[in-house]
């Protein structure tokens, strides 16, 4: 409720519902699949799809176009400079776990590495 919820409550809700290993099972109508073989399969596919678009839209795009959001250019550059090794490691992990997007994700990471190293 926007009239009674604090920012902290919203952030805790996001953390509890989205930033978990199995966000698919938090989608309405899918809760009953949590912990089942079908739920595990759908979670893996959901995570694979989400990770692909995270790499594409929130990593590669921002590295290629850091001035897309002029008010955040320095924040974006500083974030990637400080987290460069972590970003590369997590992307490599995601690629190794991907069943559908591994080749595309590998190409994106190959584009990201020189951009990260320039920071």
Segments from the language model and where they lie:
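E2/UBC-UEV (E2-variant) core
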Residues: 1-23
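Charge-rich (especially acidic), low-complexity segments
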Residues: 24-119
